[in-house]
């Protein structure tokens, strides 16, 4: 199941609704751990990733695996894949108002790799897009936290479009 919201209170409620003891959870965009604390109310294995400078010190205080990295990078995906190959819950909050195209690409890459049962995404642009659609043609629907149309694709290759938005720093 895929859930979408903008309000952070709704985001945390949606996470609480789907999480169970024993789940393997990947949290993309943990910042300083406020949502991580909600996730850790259950007995779960949590891998939290964020590239903000404030994240590291706060995340060290919590019982989880923290990776200080950019979730848009293929190297980050590979680093997490070495730790686990599947997850039960994928939580994505890249700032709430962050560019919806980037958030969708991150969702696509991470969910197609880890095949979560549930994905929760916090992003205003995606909510606005969803609520603005006046007609949908085609009978495509997914029951899990990833799109069925790419369920057998494995780890996707690096998406070259990311370089158009966030080019690698020059040496």
Residue ranges and their predicted role:
Residues 33-37:
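Glycine-rich SAM-binding Motif I of class I
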Residues 96-171:
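C-terminal substrate-binding/active-site "lid" region of AdoMet-derived donor-dependent transferases
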Residues 63-73:
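Conserved SAM-binding strand-loop segment of SAM-dependent methyltransferases
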Residues 22-31:
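Conserved class I S-adenosyl-L-methionine
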Residues 74-85:
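Short amphipathic alpha-helix with an adjacent loop that forms part of the alpha/beta core around
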Residues 59-60:
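Conserved SAM-binding loop
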Residues 52:
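Conserved SAM/SAH-binding beta-strand->alpha-helix loop
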Residues 1-22:
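S-adenosyl-L-methionine
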């Amino acid at each position: 199941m895929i859930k979408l919201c903008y309000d952070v209170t709704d985001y945390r409620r949606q996470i609480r609704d789907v999480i169970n003891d024993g789940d393997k959870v990947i949290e993309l965009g943990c910042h300083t751990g406020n949502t991580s604390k909600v996730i850790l109310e259950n007995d779960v294995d949590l891998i939290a990733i964020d590239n903000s400078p404030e994240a590291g010190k706060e995340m060290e205080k919590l019982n989880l695996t923290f990776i200080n990295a950019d979730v848009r990078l293929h190297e980050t995906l590979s680093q997490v894949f070495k730790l686990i190959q599947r997850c039960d819950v994928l939580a994505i909050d890249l700032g709430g108002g962050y560019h919806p195209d980037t958030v969708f690409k991150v969702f696509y890459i991470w969910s197609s790799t880890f095949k979560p049962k549930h994905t929760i995404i916090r992003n205003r642009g995606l909510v606005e897009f969803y609520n603005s659609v006046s007609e949908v043609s085609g009978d495509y629907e997914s029951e899990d936290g990833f799109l069925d149309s790419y369920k057998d694709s494995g780890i996707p290759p690096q998406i070259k479009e990311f370089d158009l938005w966030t080019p690698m720093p020059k040496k």
